């Protein structure tokens, strides 16, 4: 990673490689490009899809300059290292914003008129957004603490595609609330609180 002492943003021609999910990119990339054009006009960005909740190995191997996303385990590990003086940490992190996940479905869905009960949620058919392709997510982990499960009939790795699919089907999905306007489908979607407690959706940037 570039040393701050030698870095001149106005002169750099660096290509910065950043990993983030499409929902995060929809919110952050437009203002980031404006800032880059003003402060580092010769630099370029290369975005990679986010495929993991632990970007530290990719950063350590210099495959990325920066990762942006919800990394609770990785950030907790970095905080632990920072507290242990004999374990100097070569990673840095900063919270960008804290968001909220909601249960999203098409306009006119039978479950869209009121908050969804846990029983109705578990009985419904679901679309899972999974960066890594694994067939379960943090919602399923939260349900497991209540000895409950849900039926996932489709797994994919793009929030934009998820919004498009649920707008045309009876599937439910989980989306970041702040992302819904960026889909261009807000008028075709409705959303309700997720009927199981979830951790805060903290979005951090992490670097090496």
Label every PLM stretch briefly.
Residues 15-19, 67, 104, 127, ...:
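Short, well-ordered beta-strand segments
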Residues 59-60, 121, 164-169, 205:
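Hydrophobic residues within well-ordered alpha-helices
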Residues 71-86, 141, 145, 159-189:
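A ligand-binding cleft/hinge motif common to bilobed small-molecule-binding domains
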Residues 70, 105, 111-118, 122-146:
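Secondary-structure junction motif
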Residues 1-19, 37-38, 88-93:
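Short helix-loop hinge/linker segments at domain boundaries
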Residues 13-81, 156:
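Central regulatory/effector-binding core of bacterial HTH transcription factors
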Residues 87-99, 114:
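A structural signal for short loop-to-beta-strand junctions that line the ligand-binding cleft
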Residues 28, 107, 112-113, 118, ...:
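A late-sequence structural motif
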């Amino acid at each position: 990673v570039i040393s701050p002492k030698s870095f001149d943003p106005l002169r750099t021609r660096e290509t910065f490689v950043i990993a983030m999910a499409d929902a995060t990119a929809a919110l952050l990339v437009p203002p980031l490009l404006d800032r880059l054009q003003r402060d580092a006009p010769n630099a370029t960005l290369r975005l990679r899809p986010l495929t993991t909740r632990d970007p530290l190995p990719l950063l350590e191997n210099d495959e990325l300059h920066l990762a942006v996303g919800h990394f609770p385990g990785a950030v907790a590990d970095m905080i632990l290292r920072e507290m242990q003086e004999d374990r100097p940490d070569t990673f840095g992190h900063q919270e960008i914003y804290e968001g909220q996940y909601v249960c999203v479905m098409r306009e006119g869905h039978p479950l869209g008129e009121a908050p969804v009960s846990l029983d109705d949620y578990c009985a419904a058919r679901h679309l899972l957004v999974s960066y890594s392709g694994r067939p379960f997510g943090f919602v399923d982990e939260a349900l497991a603490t209540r000895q409950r499960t849900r039926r996932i009939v489709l797994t994919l790795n793009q929030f934009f595609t998820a919004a498009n699919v649920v707008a045309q089907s009876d599937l439910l999905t989980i989306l970041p609330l702040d992302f819904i306007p960026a889909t261009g489908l807000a008028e075709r979607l409705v959303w309700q609180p997720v009927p199981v407690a979830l951790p805060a959706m903290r979005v951090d940037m992490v670097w090496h």
